[in-house]
C-alpha cells in the first residue's frame, strides 16, 4: 500500500466533512443555489469531503444529520446572512465561514449599518426611514431628487428603485414593501460605482462596475452580458489604497470577519460614499469576489479554500 499523501487527502484531513449550505427561502434563493453549486463543485475538485445542503429542504435538523465538521455558508439573504444560521451553528458547536451572529445581523440591516458607520466617522449617504404614513414632501426636502428607495433587509438590489418624482417615490415605497416591512430612502450619489472584497486580513483589488442603464440592479448583477467589471479599476494607486482602507474600516466597524464585500460610490468631487456591506457575497460566474481574487492571483478553487480556512474555530 502506498504511503503517498495527495493534496486531496491532506485537504480532507485538514477540513474534515464540509457541508455547503445554500438555497433557503429568501428572495435571493436563485442566486444562492448558483453560489452554493459553484462552491461545492470547487471543494470536490480540491479533494475536500464536501456535501451540498439546500436549507429549504431539511432545515436545521437536516443539516445536523449530515454531521458536518465545518459549514460553508453560501445562503444569501434572510436566515443565511442575517445571523440566524450563524447563531444556530454556534449553539450546535459547528464552525462556519464568514461573520458571526452580530456582524451578520448588522450587515443585513442597511440602516443600522449606516448608523454604525456614521458613529465611526465613515462617509455614507444621508437616509430616512419611511415609517407609518411618510411625509413624502419632507423626505424629498431632506434628501433631494433623485433618491433611492430600499428594503432595509434585502440584498442583491432586490426591491430597490431610483426615483425622480414624488409619485415615483410613493410607487417605489409600495414596491419595496413587497419584500420588507422596513423601508428606507437614501440620497442618490451620482458617480462611479466600486466594490471592494476582503479576504481574511487582505484587501483585494477594487472593481469598478459600469452598467449601460446606469443602475446596477438584480438583472445587471446576475443576468446581463453588458455589465462591465473594470480590473484594474482605473483609480490612481493612492486613491485605490484609500478606497481599500475605508472599506476595511467599514467591514471592521460592524465586526465583520473571514470574508466580505463593501459597495461604494464615488461622486464628481472624488469623495467615496459607503453604500452597504455583504457578509455572504455571491460566488456565481458573475460575482465580484472571485473576479477580484483572480486579479490578485487566486483562482476560484484557491479562493474557496482560503475562505474555508477562515472558518470560525479553525
Curated annotation (Swiss-Prot):
Please state every residue range assigned to the domain named ATP-grasp: 114-309
Q: Which residues bind Mg(2+) 1?
A: 263, 276
What's noted on cofactor binding?
Binds 2 magnesium or manganese ions per subunit.
Q: Tell me which EC number(s) this protein carries.
A: 6.3.2.4
What are the alphabetically sorted keywords of the record? ATP-binding, Cell shape, Cell wall biogenesis/degradation, Cytoplasm, Ligase, Magnesium, Manganese, Metal-binding, Nucleotide-binding, Peptidoglycan synthesis
Question: Please, one GO biological process term?
Answer: peptidoglycan biosynthetic process
Give the matching PROSITE patterns: ATP_GRASP (PS50975), DALA_DALA_LIGASE_1 (PS00843), DALA_DALA_LIGASE_2 (PS00844)
Give GO terms: molecular function aspect only: ATP binding; D-alanine-D-alanine ligase activity; metal ion binding
Localization per record? Cytoplasm
Q: Which cofactor does it need?
A: Mg(2+); Mn(2+)
Which residues are listed for ATP binding in this entry? 140-195
Q: What protein name does the entry list? A: D-alanine--D-alanine ligase
Q: Which organism is it from?
A: Chromohalobacter salexigens (strain ATCC BAA-138 / DSM 3043 / CIP 106854 / NCIMB 13768 / 1H11)
Q: By which gene is this protein encoded? A: ddl
